[in-house]
């Protein structure tokens, strides 16, 4: 999934799904699909960086060897649900949502996002339940979690009291 970061706005504009494809081929496809775009970061599941069995290289290493540097995100379903809900609920200005999803570029995400439900097990009420079509939503949440600390500019004006202004001089 490709998401444009416009300061405090995020626009999901492109997605691609791969089935039964090796990591090196996916990396080549990502590079081809990203031609002409200024890709700043690629986020992945932390499980991609785990050595399993006798593997010398991890899946993340394979991507990086093929030209796609990756940064591991957080793997926590409670954070997934909170990140997506917060991004959909916030506005950067009146009528302009913080997160926009282009229907022409992300039809799978638009189709599967409403299918996501909360996990009803005790202690996980705020977590996103596991679902066979959760891949696009998890990808979106990896991005949102990694950008959770981005500056959020409110569209409401806050009046700064005179005594808090930098040029204010106290008189005694």
Question: Where are the model-predicted features located?
Answer:
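Mg2+-dependent endonuclease catalytic cores in nucleic-acid-processing enzymes, primarily RNase H-like
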Residues: 7-125, 131, 150, 162-172
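Gly/Thr-rich phosphate-binding beta-strand-loop-beta motif of the actin/hexokinase/Hsp70
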Residues: 1-6
